[in-house]
Regions:
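Single conserved hydrophobic/aromatic residue that forms the stacking wall/gate
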Residues: 1-8, 12
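Histidine- and acidic-residue-rich, metal-dependent catalytic cores
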Residues: 14-293
Length: 293
């Protein structure tokens, strides 16, 4: 499994911070392409799943760490989906810049995963303010990058169909990838208050809204990162605690587990066990993951 060192992550985080600030001030990009190329070179050609690594975040580096994580997820998912190289590049660039409009904002609503329509609207409005700058900052690729950003942020409002019209346009593949990657990281990242939700909770949300989060894209995310690898401790809907023995590639939330209570083995994919659900995973409080070397 590929290892991403903390030192390397900090370097890329600083580069993203500097690039976002430069574009906002000068309306010109300088290093976006090289950052995107680096991410694609390291994560856009992997043929194995990785344990997705979450860093602790501060108010000062929240958006740059988020942008880096989303860019990494986008590189992996576009590779799994065999998206053509140009759109993969546009998608990773969009991930690097999609939250640029929030950089100078300090309201709590911009940190973490928005769960109400009002929060979503504020996020959308703030992000879209910066998207015109993206097209201006790039000589030739700006239009494609901007469209991916705009489609992804607007599609989020379809989570609240009773309060507004659904988007009518055909989503670009890259926009679907950005939408899924962004939401996954929003949910699983450590908040400024020190709380986080698990990858299981994130995946449950993505799977519950197939009209918003493209199912093919969600499947590609599942093929890119470990959600419930062997050895993961889980809580079942029966109240029991269990250990994952074998993954289920077809239905990742229904693996084979062994109960801590009596060492019984349960294959959650069998019809007889369909009433038993995985409620959540059990992990350390700081939400950090260890990469296998």
């Amino acid at each position: 499994t590929r290892v991403r060192s903390s030192a390397a992550s900090d370097v890329y985080k600083r580069q993203i911070e500097e690039e976002q600030d430069r574009i906002l001030k000068t309306r010109k990009q300088n290093r976006t392409q090289s950052i995107a190329d680096m991410v694609i070179r390291n994560y856009g050609h992997l043929d194995e799943k990785i344990n997705f690594y979450q860093n602790l975040r501060s108010r000062e580096d929240y958006f740059s760490r988020h942008s880096l994580n989303v860019a990494i997820l986008c590189a992996m998912v576009t590779h799994v989906m065999n998206i053509r190289r140009e759109e993969q590049y546009h998608t990773v660039c969009a991930a690097i810049l999609h939250d640029m409009g929030k950089v100078k904002k300090h309201d709590a609503v911009y940190y973490g995963a928005p769960y109400t329509r009002e929060d979503m609207l504020r996020n959308c409005e703030t992000q879209e303010e910066a998207y015109g700058i993206i097209e201006e900052a790039f000589a030739t690729d700006g239009s494609g990058i901007r469209r991916i950003c705009q489609q992804a942020v607007r599609k989020q409002l379809d989570l609240f169909p009773e309060d507004g019209e659904k988007s009518r346009y055909k989503m670009l593949a890259g926009a679907n990838v950005l939408l899924v990657a962004n939401r996954y990281d929003e949910i699983t990242a450590m908040t400024l208050q020190g709380t986080a939700q698990s990858e299981v909770k994130a995946l449950q949300e993505l799977l519950e809204h197939p009209k918003v989060y493209d199912p093919e894209t969600v499947r590609a995310l599942i093929r890119s990162i470990n959600i419930l690898p062997p050895g993961a401790s889980v809580e079942l809907s029966t109240g029991e605690k269990a250990l994952v023995l074998n993954e289920n590639e077809e239905s990742v939330l229904r693996p084979t587990v062994v109960s801590f209570r009596d060492n019984s083995i349960l294959d959650l994919s069998l019809p007889g066990n369909e009433d038993i659900q995985i409620v959540d995973v059990m992990k350390t409080m700081d939400n950090r993951y260890i990469f296998n070397k």
